[in-house]
Curated annotation (Swiss-Prot):
Role played: Palmitoyltransferase that could catalyze the addition of palmitate onto various protein substrates. Catalyzes palmitoylation of Cys residues in the cytoplasmic C-terminus of EGFR, and modulates the duration of EGFR signaling by modulating palmitoylation-dependent EGFR internalization and degradation. Has a preference for acyl-CoA with C16 fatty acid chains. Can also utilize acyl-CoA with C14 and C18 fatty acid chains. May palmitoylate CALHM1 subunit of gustatory voltage-gated ion channels and modulate channel gating and kinetics.
Recorded GO CC terms: endoplasmic reticulum membrane; endoplasmic reticulum-Golgi intermediate compartment membrane; Golgi membrane; perinuclear region of cytoplasm; plasma membrane
Protein name: Palmitoyltransferase ZDHHC20
EC number(s) from the headed UniProt entry: 2.3.1.225, 2.3.1.-
Catalyzed reactions: L-cysteinyl-[protein] + hexadecanoyl-CoA = S-hexadecanoyl-L-cysteinyl-[protein] + CoA; L-cysteinyl-[protein] + tetradecanoyl-CoA = S-tetradecanoyl-L-cysteinyl-[protein] + CoA; L-cysteinyl-[protein] + octadecanoyl-CoA = S-octadecanoyl-L-cysteinyl-[protein] + CoA
Localization (cell): Golgi apparatus membrane; Cell membrane; Cytoplasm, Perinuclear region; Endoplasmic reticulum membrane
PTM-bearing positions, type Phosphoserine: S320, S345, S354
Family as reported in the entry's similarity comment: Belongs to the DHHC palmitoyltransferase family.
Binding annotation for substrate: K135, H140, H141, C142, S143
Species name: Mus musculus
GO process annotations (BP): peptidyl-L-cysteine S-palmitoylation; positive regulation by host of viral process; protein palmitoylation
A Gene Ontology molecular function term of the record: protein-cysteine S-palmitoyltransferase activity
Chain positions recorded as Zn(2+) 1 binding sites: C128, C131, H141, C148
């Protein structure tokens, strides 16, 4: 076995360690809460009604948490469609050229009919040498997955997967339900945690008040109640900050990568280039049908290869002024931004500036056509 192949195999094995750790914590929390707290402790104190309510609510949060976590892990990140790959002749000419300028000319001709509006910081076509494809807007190459991922947000070690277009909604729901799960566990365990410290801080259970429904009456629950509260509180605080940050990103229609390195458009760098207004930004991730918002079912809008941009239909000079003054905030809430299919997309970014002057802003009108579809793969 080649050293590189062996290294990749080791990486894949080690990548599952954080997932196994989370799985162990979740399984232990289930046992500690259901068996040690509810069955062995609360039910024996005569509080049958409380036990039933706690168990029903707990299993609701638990199922939604595990479901969203599973979908985040096993939903395969989408890669660019075949339109973004160079043809054999284009690839051969590109590899034979040593001049970067001529290579860019080849890429510009290949990308003329693609819905690409962003470039690299040096105004070059974003091309992936490893995957040998022209990167769609917001797509990036993940070194851990060794592939280009559509609308890549980040590679998350806790799910051993890339978070991108196909599973970003699942990732958000995973954060939400893990937050609610930890909050519920911490809040319901707190009562018995306090009794443990205030009523029975003595050397043996024989000295504890016999009429108190305290966890020390059941020695096996002491360890679990103590650590269950600490673990749930700790995870709640850490997940809360991460969830708040990603809510802010969704509201701004940015990825984690774009928050650190704003995309480059024809009119310059614009961190809000894909922002259509808070409401539309949220619907891009969660979809138009509210009944699916809280369910780990794919409902995101678009095809992952092309995204509506707020200034794309404007003259470059006007766009530059609008970008500086942030004058287009109202666009997001009032005007539609349809996504054009790849077969009928007109690439304004890669055309010459003279075409802007000839065609004017009317080039921004979207043609009708068949839609591209993204297939969400679930790996078993």
């Amino acid at each position: 076995m080649a050293p590189w192949t062996l290294w990749r195999c080791c990486q894949r094995v080690v990548g599952w360690v954080p997932v196994l750790f989370i799985t162990f914590v979740v399984v232990w929390s289930y046992y500690a809460y259901v068996v040690e707290l509810c069955v062995s402790t609360i039910s024996r104190t005569g509080e049958k009604g409380k036990t039933v309510v706690y168990l029903v609510a707990f299993h609701l949060f638990f199922v939604m948490f595990v479901w969203s976590y599973w979908m985040t892990i096993f939903t395969s990140p989408a890669s660019p469609s075949k339109e973004f790959y160079l043809s054999n002749s284009e690839k051969e000419r590109y590899e034979k050229e040593f001049s970067q300028e001529r290579q860019q000319d080849i890429l510009r001709r290949a990308a003329r009919d693609l819905p690409i509006y962003t470039t690299s910081a040096s105004k070059a076509i974003r091309y992936c040498e490893k995957c040998q494809l022209i990167k769609p807007d917001r797509a990036h190459h993940c070194s851990a997955c060794d592939r280009c991922v559509l609308k890549m947000d980040h590679h998350c070690p806790w799910v051993n997967n890339c978070v991108g277009f196909t599973n970003y909604k699942f990732f958000m729901l995973f954060l939400l339900y893990s937050l609610l799960y930890c909050l519920f566990v911490a809040a319901t365990v707190l009562e018995y945690f306090i009794k443990f410290w205030t009523l029975c801080r003595r050397k043996s259970t024989e000295n504890c008040p016999k009429n108190e429904p305290t966890v020390l009456n059941f020695p096996s629950a002491k360890f679990h109640v103590l650590f269950l509260f600490f673990v749930s509180a700790m995870f709640f605080v850490s997940v809360l900050s991460l969830f708040s940050y990603h809510c802010w990103l969704v509201g701004k229609n940015r990825t984690t990568i774009e928050s650190f390195r704003a995309p480059m458009f024809s009119y310059g760098i614009d961190g809000n280039g894909f922002s259509l207004g808070c409401s539309k930004n949220w619907r891009q991730v969660f979809g138009d049908e509210k009944k699916y918002w809280l369910v780990p079912i794919f409902s995101s809008l678009g095809d992952g290869c092309s995204f509506p941009a707020r200034l794309v239909g404007m003259d470059p000079e006007q766009a530059s002024v609008a970008n500086q003054s942030d004058y287009v905030r109202s666009i997001g809430s009032n005007q539609p931004f349809p996504i054009k299919p790849l077969s009928e997309s007109k690439n304004r970014l890669l055309d010459s500036e003279s075409q802007w002057l000839e065609n004017g802003a009317e080039e921004g009108v979207t043609k009708s056509g068949t839609n591209n579809h993204v297939t969400v793969e679930i790996e078993n």
